[in-house]
Design a protein with these regions (language model features):
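N-terminal secretory signal peptides that target proteins for export/translocation
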Residues: 1-2
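Sec-dependent N-terminal signal peptides
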Residues: 5-13
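C-terminal motif of bacterial Sec signal peptides marking the signal peptidase cleavage site
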Residues: 16-19
């Protein structure tokens, strides 16, 4: 009897040890990632990251890389304890000092860390062809811009029109910046080629707000279920991905007489009739219901929201 009790005790001890070992292995293989996610979430300072969106989406950034990021306005807002959801965050070009998995080091007056989801890396060696729409910055000034390629004689340094610059009906208007900076050359390694139908940084989106209106925005980053965007007055916001639609970049689907929604101030709720389409320049002449004619970029008019 005593031998049986001793044998049962040995077996129980062995099973307990095996169970503990199994739990340790599970922790090593699975729970560590959960713990890391919980730790990362716990480390998020709501004042420095008020958006319900990951601080990184797996960006492949490198030390010294040329990027677009709101590295000046973000730091000023943090230092002044401003509400980042109400602050305009203009994306400028700069170079990373040190790339990280969640945040990367940039410099504005001093080195500091910026969450990677607010950083758009620009690859080296990109080439473009006529009609391509690119993400770049205004190279006669500053600030994120989309541009359409007019001349691809040198695919690494194309000549472009800036689609985010205003075009007037009167070509001689002093505010006709699109005409003033037409056929501008881009520096090599300074742009990203955008693709229709892809949820990639720089594309135009329309996201339905709580009032049922379609807010216009530029996509910064996307996950499977959320988008981080740059909206009206350069404010960063988050929407459910299911509430957003990509705005087509190809104007070939537009023709005179088409009824479209056009960007007015901050939304796509104004209705227009297409008068003329300039596919080469990515511009559309439209008239609203009050009889006023305007020139809009191909990113500012659409039929996909009907």
């Amino acid at each position: 009897m005593m031998k049986k009790l001793i044998l049962m005790a040995v077996i129980a001890t062995s099973m307990t040890a095996m169970s503990c070992a199994g739990n340790s292995e599970n922790n090593a293989n699975g729970s560590d990632s959960t713990a890391a996610e919980q730790t990362a979430a716990a480390e998020v300072d709501p004042a420095a990251w008020p958006w319900d969106f990951p601080q990184s989406t797996g960006e492949q950034l490198t030390d010294g890389q040329l990027v677009l990021a709101p590295y000046t306005y973000y730091k000023v807002a943090i230092d002044d304890k401003e509400d980042l959801t109400r602050k305009g965050l203009i994306f400028y070009n700069t170079n990373l000092k040190k790339a990280g998995a969640q945040k990367s080091v940039v410099n504005f007056k001093e080195d500091y860390e910026l969450p990677n989801s607010l950083i758009i890396g620009i690859p080296e060696g990109a080439t473009a062809k006529k009609g391509d729409i690119l993400l770049t910055w205004w190279q006669q000034g500053s600030g994120l811009r989309r541009a359409i390629v007019r001349d691809d004689s040198n695919p690494a340094e194309p000549l472009v029109d800036y689609l985010d610059s205003r075009m007037e009906i009167d070509p001689n208007s002093p505010t006709n910046f699109a005409e003033k900076y037409a056929n501008s050359p881009l520096k090599p390694n300074s742009f990203i080629v955008l693709h229709d139908g892809q949820w990639e940084p720089g594309v135009q989106v329309a996201c339905k707000n709580s009032r049922g209106e379609w807010d216009a925005a530029k996509l910064i980053k996307a996950t499977d279920d959320k988008v981080l965007v740059l909206g009206f007055s350069d404010r960063v916001a988050v929407y459910p991905k299911s509430d957003c639609k990509l705005i087509p970049m190809n104007s070939e689907g537009l023709k005179p007489g088409d009824k479209v929604r056009g960007l007015f101030v901050a939304t796509y709720n104004e209705e227009y009739t297409v008068d003329k389409v300039d596919t080469e320049r990515g511009r559309v002449w439209v008239t609203n219901d009050r009889g006023k004619q305007e020139v809009k970029s191909v990113l500012e008019v659409t039929k996909v929201l009907d």
